[in-house]
Amino acid sequence: MDRRTLLSAGGAFAFAGGASSAQADVSSLRGPYIDLTTGRGNMIARARIDGNLDESKIKYGTGTGVVSGVRPGEAVRELFGFEIFSAARLRRQSEDAFQLLHREVVYYTDLKSGEIINDFHNPYLDEWVKVVDIVNDPWDEKIEAYYPDPPSYGGLIKPPSGPKRPYILNWKSAPGGVLCAMQQIDLYYPATLKPDKWPRESAGPMNQVTEIYTFFVNAADMQNPAKTSLVCNGTWSRVTPWLPWMLMGQAPGHILYSATTASFDDLNLAKRNVVDYTLKHYPQMMTPPGAWSDTSLSSLEMYAREQKPAPLKSKP
């Protein structure tokens, strides 16, 4: 969820506009500090968006949005809101690579009050279900001059073959001295939640997931070497199977996340209720991990590890 590892193309992975910087005015992307038409320039830019080149400092990420249900033959339905909070720190590995030590939580909220919820009345089932928070501890990433290999999700995804591609986003200039870019990640991989063991939680034998990011950054800040960290506003959308705790089983349809996002250095810019809830329930998530971990599982894989299959619903 969210700040996800930037996956390489090939096999089950595809990018929309990943390297189409020719669409932009190239002169606006080549500056005195970094060149956004190169892999190394994009690496430095992304490191300053998701982290801070000053490794003593923490970078925070937030998101606020809505989760909607999509079923054939009817209008999309807003179900509940959600809040994202993350904490990250950079570690420089080489001229062409950073590690991003990163933790992330996602809470679900009531659409009207905005309060974090622990249960939800599923209108599709007319049934109350227990809400399960997303706690990605850790979700470490590599930020490199080349597209890194994807996370394995415990061996479910195999690394692509072939030569590495330079990590170049489709940056372009926008009115108001802003640079913007978009990235799309498309995944199709075996599900950990198998229907035979998880009949109410599993949407099927395969996970079909798409994530779409947009980034908006001040162009002058991008070329200012004194700015070791960049304030970034953007959006994040995710198409994903029914959330397992909704107990939809293999019913036709899927979930759509849509959110506005931000990254910044000042914790005071995060929502107070989200920070307070994190301090109370997951205090370790307020700071990044102290060391790199190769084990970064998605929320679906974590659900399989931490939850138990719900009992089958009795027939009337």
Q: Where are the regions a protein language model picked out?
A:
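Edge beta-strand at a domain terminus
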Residues: C232-P316
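Predominantly extracellular/secreted and cell-surface proteins with exposed
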Residues: R71-D221
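Intrinsically disordered, low-complexity, compositionally biased regions/tails
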Residues: A14-F15, S21-A22, M43, N118, ...
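N-terminal segment immediately downstream of the Sec signal-peptide cleavage site
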Residues: D25-E104, T109, S298-K315
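Generic hydrophobic, helix-prone segments enriched in Leu/Val/Ile
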Residues: K59-V66, A88, V105-Y107, Q208-N218, ...
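N-terminal export signals
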Residues: M1-D25
